[in-house]
Amino acid sequence: MKYEKMNNLFLRQSYLDSWEDYERSLKKKKFIKWDYIILTASNDAQAAAYQNQINDRLEKGLLPEDTHYAVLPDPDGKRVGSGGATFQVLRYIAQQEPGVENPFKERRILVIHSGGDSKRVPQYSAIGKLFSPVPRELPDGRGSTLFDEFIVGMSGVPSRIQEGMLVLSGDVLLLFNPLQIDAQLDGAAAISIKEPVETGKNHGVFLNDGHDYVKCFLHKQTEEHLREMGAVNEAGNVDLDTGAVFFGSGLLQALLGLISTDGQVDDVKFHQFCNEEARISFYGDFLYPLASDSTLEDFYKEAAEGELNEALHECRTKIWNAIHSFSMKLLCLSPAEFIHFGTTRELRDLVTRNVQDYEFLDWKMQVNVAVPKEGFAAHNAYVGRHAEVGKEAYLENAYVLGNAKIGEGTVISHVKIKNCEIPGQIVLHGIELIGGKKVVRIYGVPDNPKAKYPNEVAFLGTTLNRFMEMNGVTKEELWKDEETYLWFADLYPICEDHKTALDMAMIVYKMAHGEASEEEIQMWRSSERMSLYSSFNAADIDAFCELNTFLENHVLARRFIWNLEQGMFYQEALKVFGKRGISEEIFRLLLEEAEEAEFSLKIRIYHAISRYMKKTRTVYSGIHYDAIESDCYDTIQNVIYAETEKKLPDNAGYRIAKDRVDIELP
């Protein structure tokens, strides 16, 4: 058997085992679980959205209820770095465990850093990459997200550690078997996997000291430098930093000491390490001092998450003195898989042309799609029967209705398209702002929001420079006080409704290609506009979540009815709802569909719903199964009566001939 096939079989079985661990964590009180699961967020709005997602899962019994959950936003919306966010986590746990010498002792803690801006995949800036879709339907019928994958995949880890904190990066999916882990330690342990040097040069790489401890941490180094350092083995592979790191309770206590006085969190010390100026990095500032070959002089020169300045210099000195005596073990897992949700193009390719690479995990191009069609990827999308979607396009939380045409390779997210044509290789992402106004952002799939003008900045198949020249747009019209990155360019008009916002986005596209009329250019110029950055910060996160739920309900209802229309037995058709079953909202949608359906489909809908309600003993708004059952048989009765009545002879000319007629039996 080939290695790749064995590797995939192992990972598939590992995932199935993790799912069983996950189900046990929901049902068994004595199953060892995480004591804390803590997420970090970029601002209060994103934190509220994360908390709503967690609460929704808790209400549905989809998360272990004994675990303590928390979401910690960067303070006042200031970017404090992943290290600053980690200090917030340490402070929070210390506050939850008052009067304890070491609050991390005998505590199993999972931390997911998910507070980035998602500049390289802007459609996830508002709601965060953490709850972005994964192209898989979970065994209970739900469409999966990165968060769900983390929860399932890490369910077996608590039983493998006595105490400590596992820190994960919110944009990396790591697949492994928890039985591969033995993290009984006081310092740190980095989880690594073997990957080709071509992959490693774009990420962090660990250099093994020969005794399975980290000798050196190499972040985004050239292939040549990695080879010079001896980080590349004979097979051309490196020990890749997966973003997953264990911190023992002793190391955590040492870090807590930096922000404490006499065992109590000191606000002055805390703010020295958690602020926008220092912007401490978890990976750069916490891991570097733990490598055995690290020096304080080189530590000062390490690239910063923000800027190298005096505030960071002082923090690094104190961090070094506190934790350099600890070491970092290297846990190189094999078989294991590292999936990075990086740029928009990488995401699109992952869910379209490369999705077959993960068939062993039941990944597929379409998850929760109303009317299945071939050739494109979709997640929670309602695609009309007459709509045309181009090859390798990706639709996510979107409506595509009427005679709409979507170009090849285009990404559509949170947008409703009806009876219009969308070009290929672009991204359309709709945002509802706080207050109800709408913005539709448009950019090219390969565009990099981190690119800076006046350098050549790719934009919608041309360049931002060319866009400005052709339409007479000045630098001052796009940027006010911000730096001249595409990320900050005020390109997207604020509109009263979604359709107008979509129309204005298409005007931006026409302007990029020199096809906009003077009137259209003037409409754009006179409008109030936002950038990728400002629009995500002003987004109504609750509206995002409501749209996702609204779409999911409509898609599930449509899938169920589609199955019935294709002649599927009702019990099989009901499986689209998974273990969640039929919610109150879906029940209402199905009744509305039944009202409009032709006879055969109508009675099948009523019959299926009534059987489901009877079996599950479900009552919706006081309506019992027998009422729906009666609707089914009343419909049949009415149709039979109507059809029979049609066949009766015309009695319009009948008259009473006699007052009485006597009939005698023989």
Predicted regions and their residues:
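Ser/Pro-rich intrinsically disordered low-complexity regulatory regions in eukaryotic proteins
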Residues: 372, 388-389
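Long, charged amphipathic helices and adjacent flexible linkers at domain junctions
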Residues: 360-375
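Unchanged
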Residues: 2-358, 390-666
